[in-house]
Amino acid sequence: AAFALPAFASFEKDVITPAALEAVLNRKAPLYNIMMENDAILNVIANVKTVISNPVLEEALLKTNHGVNGIPCGESCVWIPCLTSAVGCSCKSKVCYRNSLDN
């Protein structure tokens, strides 16, 4: 039996959209005791995630048809856990989702 990975699983790194990245930065930056510049945070994230556009991720999600898992957070979790867990997302089927019923 053939096993088809979602399109984003073919990347060497997990992916994150600019909107998801901004949500993580807005949530995490106030928590640092020593304020890191956003550029430094972006460099760290860029080492573990690849920033991609929303249409690329949306196309991959449409092809895999995992819409029942919740609202996509704009990040994959094939190799690295969801950075967007800081804003309520969790990993399901290699994609970070937020349960729309959670507050």
Swiss-Prot record:
Excised during maturation, the propeptide residues are 10-69, 100-103
Query: Which SUPFAM superfamilies does the record cross-reference, listed alphabetically?
Result: Cyclotides
**Which InterPro entries does the UniProt entry name for this protein?**
Cyclotide, Cyclotide_bracelet_CS, Cyclotide_sf
As given in the record, the signal peptide range reads 1-9
**What is known about its processing and modification?**
This is a cyclic peptide.
Protein's UniProt keywords contain Disulfide bond: yes
> What UniProt keywords apply to this chain's record, in alphabetical order?
Disulfide bond, Knottin, Plant defense, Signal
Sorted alphabetically, the Gene Ontology BP terms of this entry are:
defense response
Q: Where is this cross-link: Cyclopeptide (Gly-Asn)?
A: G70-N99
Cysteine disulfide partners in this protein: C73-C89, C77-C91, C82-C96
Domain commentary:
The presence of a 'disulfide through disulfide knot' structurally defines this protein as a knottin.
- Explain the purpose of this protein: Probably participates in a plant defense mechanism.
> What family is this?
Belongs to the cyclotide family. Bracelet subfamily.
Q: What is this protein called?
A: Cycloviolacin-O9
